[in-house]
Amino acid sequence: MSNRTSLLGAVTLFAVLSSACAQQYTGPPADLVIRNAKVVTIDHDNRRAQAVAMIGEEIIGVTSNRAIGQYIEEGTTQVIDADRRLVIPGFNDAHAHWASLNPDYIELRYITDKNIITEGVRERVAQVQPGELIRGGHWEHEMFTDKQWPTKELLDEVAPNNPVSLSRADGHSVLVNSYVLRASGITNDTPDPFGGEIQRDPVTGEATGIFKESASSLLNYNAVRVERTPEEQAERSRRGWDAANEMAMRLGVTSIQHPGGGNADLYQSMLDEGRLPYRIDVAGRLTDNADALARYDELRKRFPPEGNWIRFGYLKGFIDGTLGSGTALFFEPFEDEPDKSGLAMMPYEDLERQILASDAMGFQIGIHAIGTKANNWILNAWEKAQEVNGVRDSRHRSEHAQVLIDEDIPRFAELGVIASMQPTHCITDKRFAEKRIGLERSAGAYAWRRLLDAGVHIAFGTDYSVEPLEPLEGLYAAVTRKDRAGEEGDGWFPDQKLTMEEAIELYTLGAAYAQFMEDRKGMLKVGYLADMIIMDNDLLTIPEDEIMTSNVDYTIVGGKIVYQRDGAR
């Protein structure tokens, strides 16, 4: 143990004892102090403070303006005068598909005119060589004027000699052009794979260019490889990651839980270079393969849960699709497609077998589950795992837990299952939810209040890049349940709204609990990691229409200022 670690341990213990005994702090001076603030700690034993003191990575004082002076030494301690601004724990995104930013990606989020797709592809074709793959996405057909799915005809005229792949916003459907269909050998007779659907013209039976879920595995892009030198590729990667990291810091995201995978060694190299400004959990894929589980176990030993920066110990699986793509798995058919009730990504027996094997190895498991039947299945499988493997503090997770039947809500608490939810999905999906599943089933959608009242642990995230990496949009969604345009009224199923402080807690302490880190992250408390943000507005008191336009003034990770907004004092 280093002298620095020993010192921090002693300082932490002394600070706790000092607080309990109302003694003066006499330890070493703080490295960083925030004072004259409105500190919302998320610590139920000490909800409010005015100042925070830090040494190294840890918090050593959460106190009043009067008492903070004892932590300050001129010339040693950096002091931020918050001028009564709000200080809260840093946002911990419990579900983000994290990646570097691709400058060549065609961004189609929020478009309402399908012709923008054509023009975006036309512009990109002019910049690439024939045969080079063109990628883009985040389009949402429910936002189009006609609310109809796009088809390959939007792409064929402008990209006859390039493969084009444009993902729907949810990432569960993709639009491709005829170049890709030919390269893939897709014909009218190509069958749908298990857990997937090739969308077809109802008259001709011809593929429209939309491939849902596992059907995308049939696609062969036959793309020309872009030749870059190793130096060019390294610089391109560096720029992409630096842009992504800057975005996270600008938005106050100090921790990321990456359920889709992630390269732990890449993050370690960035950490070693001083370029990793957030903490991150990476994941593996749910399996019952003994060799794969053994490899995951070795990775867990290299990046153990006791670590604070890069951690591994979570396996992710899928059991259904999404509401927007019409592939979420329900007990009853869809209202707008009565011949369909969603797609299972695997038979229940396979799900149960994989969960039993992974649970027996002590892994935390998260399953993508949107529909009522999907969530019921995963609860049943986890109940079986407890019967077979025994009960432990597993904290398995329903990733999304979007639409639930009444009987399953208390089962989350009974089984210790975490509802890992993304509040912006509520205000995105509510545009079409009642059309797809009706009013009665919609009452069980994004049921935050009912889950909390039942004693269920909830963790909030964004599902980036399905939704923007914008925690403030999530907070707005949680407290209003209104669309981003600020519609009139009380919001969609307003009885499920949260208070702002509850929503912040689910983005901080709730997310930390979901990764077994509630003992050292998610609160502003002595001995906890010094991850926090200073806001330009008081989120607890401002009008709801100002929430999404508020800004993070400072982002602090491990006691270091990693972001300061231009013009922020």
Language model features: what each stretch is:
Residues A22-R35, V40, H44-D297, G313, ...:
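Divalent metal-binding segments
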Residues M270-R275, R300-G307, N389-V391, F412-G416:
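Acidic (Asp/Glu)-rich catalytic clusters
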Residues Q564-R569:
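Glycine- and charge-enriched low-complexity intrinsically disordered segments
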Residues G9-S19:
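Bacterial N-terminal signal peptides
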Residues R228, L356-G366, I370-H396, H400-A401, ...:
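His/Asp/Glu-enriched, well-ordered alpha-helical/loop segment
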Residues M1-A10:
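Bacterial N-terminal signal peptides that target proteins for export
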Residues F303-P304, P543-I547:
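Short proline/glycine-enriched turn/loop segments at secondary-structure junctions
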